[in-house]
Amino acid sequence: MKPTAYFCMEFAIHQPLKTYAGGLGFLAGSHFRAAKRLNQPLVGVSILWSYGYYDQLRDREGKMKVEYIRKYYDFLEDIKLKVPVTINNNTVWVKAYKLEEDVFGTCPIYFLTTDIPENDDFSRTITHNLYDANNILHIAQQIVLGIGGYKVIKECENVKLFHMNEPHPLPLVFKLIEEYGLEYTREHTVFTTHTPLPEGNETQDINLLKSMGFFGNVDVKLAEKLGGNPFNYTVCALRVCKRANAVSKKHKEVCDRMWSWVKDRCEIVAITNAQDKYYWQDPVIREAAKKYDIDMLRERKMELKEILFEEVADQTGKIFKKDRLTVVWARRFTAYKRPHILLHDEMRLLELLKKKRIQVIWAGKPHPNDHNMIATFNWIVSKTRDMKGATILTGYELKLSKMLKQGSDIWLNTPKLNHEASGTSGMTASMNASIHMSTLDGWHVEWAKMYPDDSFTIGDGVRDDDAYVANCIYNLLEEVADMYDTERWWMKACNCVNHIVEYFDAERMAKEYAEKLYK
């Protein structure tokens, strides 16, 4: 592969480094761990968020509370480099820090900040919060990542290819056009799209972008020719880049249909997401499954459930039992993922909790300005407060995510059909003998086809209303509860652990990026 700079708004590397919000960051983190082991010439560019995404805490009544707590790190190297970018006709200084390879076992990553004394108050706030709801700050963040990141890479590295993971760093391509022309840019940029719906692809008023410096010194007429007006980031990236990739086979089919009208667009290839088994998988579970040692697997799973249930008790005052089937719904809290679905028929759920001895845990972070989803989170808090065997946890970050995946028995995934480009949380759960139960969307389409006996599929993949999906889940859970903790269950778990890493480990993904995108 060509030496490549990988630009991404977020990286989930390790619990102490709060530079991520969700799946995009989890994917980038796993990619960089695998690429390091494979000795791939990959370097990352991201932003050092002063306050991270946000800290998810509880108020006095136990409801979710958003807090912004400044983060400090002593493991990032100050490389003594500041580069200027122009935002709103104002010079903003961007300072770079470097995460060296040996700190967390990744390829190197440069983290950028504007939160330094050389900048005015507004400029300092640009890198305060990941995915800031203020649109002006949001665009400014993209300029810092794209143009500031390019200038840092130009000073520090010798790369031959620029990869945009999502089109957030799109100002990068206009900087390349400005310096080298459109044809050079087309030969030296690639990008990854993660969005299966047209409305999920970012658009902005082209004159606003021009006034903010998004296009640098490139003529706005060329920008409009590439991205239209309103300016569509993904359309522009498809026209400017050498190649693009979707993040699952189904997502590629969706993208080819969705963007069939775009003239002169690049090829879209499929590279299905994956996760790093060496970070996410418990080594004892790996060993037990490999030997098909059911007693060893069961014993370790019970130990991991105890660890998870200590966290449950600490947060909620509820005592969960390790001999009960434990179902977890945990991921980014957003409407299309349907976190509410298990409570669609409350009486059916109560019956499962009582008669089938099932336990349920929710966790996940809504966007701090998504008041509807924060209300949904708090509705689940109130619904489960007096519900024995059901609860919801706060603080869904890498540490808790790993704890939930290792301590659960069923990993529940309920996206609306054709809304999930890939998803990855179920991969890492499956690596830890937590069996995936999902609607037929995203990566699950491939997993269910490869090994239909290693997961549970919700519904027929056609009907998708909440009542139908909820009823399918309740019926499945009734069957699964009867199977749980039998020899058949643990054999299924062993197969799941062994088979998932054949295709959904990050080393396969990193090799495919090298072969299909970075060639």
Curated annotation (Swiss-Prot):
Gene3D superfamilies reported for this sequence: Glycogen Phosphorylase B
Pfam families: Phosphorylase
Biological processes annotated in GO: carbohydrate metabolic process
GO terms for MF: glycogen phosphorylase activity; pyridoxal phosphate binding
Origin: domain of life: Archaea
Cystine bridges: none
InterPro entries reported in the protein's UniProt record: Agluc_phsphrylas, Glyco_trans_35, Glycogen/Maltodextrin_Phosph
Family matches, as NCBIfam families: more_P_ylases
Family: Belongs to the glycogen phosphorylase family.
Name of the protein: Uncharacterized protein MJ1631
UniProt source species: Methanocaldococcus jannaschii (strain ATCC 43067 / DSM 2661 / JAL-1 / JCM 10045 / NBRC 100440)
